[in-house]
Regions:
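Short amphipathic alpha-helical coupling elements at transmembrane boundaries
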Residues: 1, 73-77, 149, 183, ...
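Transmembrane helix boundary and interhelical loop/hinge segments in multi-pass membrane proteins
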Residues: 2, 6, 55-80, 90
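Residue-level signature of transmembrane alpha-helical entry/exit and packing/kink sites
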Residues: 8, 12, 16, 37-46, ...
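Alpha-helical transmembrane segments and their short interhelical loops
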Residues: 82, 86-165, 218-222, 226, ...
Length: 246
């Protein structure tokens, strides 16, 4: 389990915050025509990476490890169904992701002058983006774990794509500096839309002009994250296995 691996816990909670501080400290210039620094934009977007880290990466690794050591095979001997197993895993991830979000929000507010939502609508948006992002990334983590033979191989197939997606999704660098083909690739995956949703409530309203569509596109964020959640669940139910023997 995640909480039984201290090194994994430490890496999960520290890495997004450390990367946020480093990148935010490097990119300090304000965006043209605004008073908001590039560091603030990165800090707001980094919440998406935090969720990806606690859900997709850690579930992919921990489930592959449990399968490799026989933990899932033993669990199969209980009344637990695959669906209830998924629900339990996502609930655990939600708690960890919430703690990660609190840490990143604290860094953003204290170091990069982010402002928490000032109205119920902003908090509502922050909440549903968080929930849908957690669910979609968790299900993708469960799905990808089926293609890893152990924790080591799972670390490779989860961390590799995750790092690449940060660059094309506007978390490590602002979207305004990315070429069109990178924007197209990033728009396929959940991380880009999660980051956009978080920026919409943590940055000043006028920052919307720096989004590719010139709009926060809340409706599209909802549709994309919901689609990935539904697709992820279907994929998990189709390929999930309790042991390496099937």
């Amino acid at each position: 389990m995640f909480y039984r691996r201290p090194e994994q816990v430490a890496l999960t909670f520290s890495m997004p915050a450390v990367i946020c501080i480093l990148l935010g400290s490097i990119f300090t210039a304000t965006l043209p025509g605004s008073s908001t620094s590039t560091g603030s934009v990165i800090a707001a977007s980094m919440l998406a990476y935090g969720i990806l880290s606690t859900s997709f990466i850690n579930l992919g690794i921990s489930i592959a490890a449990d399968r490799d050591t026989g933990g899932l095979r033993r669990l199969r001997g209980t009344p637990t169904t695959a669906t209830s197993y998924f629900v339990g895993k996502i609930a655990l991830v939600a708690v960890v992701s919430f703690a990660e979000a609190v840490i990143l929000l604290a860094v953003g507010v204290l170091v990069f002058n982010l402002h928490l939502p000032s109205d119920p609508g902003g908090w509502f948006t922050l909440t549903w983006v968080f929930v849908l992002g957690t669910v979609s990334c968790s299900l993708l983590g469960i799905f990808i774990s089926n293609y890893a033979s152990n924790a080591v191989s799972a670390a490779v197939i989860t961390n590799g794509p995750s790092v690449a997606l940060q660059f094309v999704s506007g978390t490590y660098v602002p979207l305004v500096v990315l070429p069109a083909w990178m924007l197209t690739i990033g728009s396929i995956f959940p991380i880009k839309w999660m980051a956009q949703g978080f920026r919409s409530v943590l940055l000043p309203p006028e920052m919307v002009v720096f989004e590719p569509a010139g709009s926060w596109e809340h409706w599209r964020i909802f549709l994309v994250l919901t689609a990935w959640s539904v697709g992820g669940l279907i994929g998990c139910l189709a390929v999930f296995r309790w042991s390496d023997e099937g």
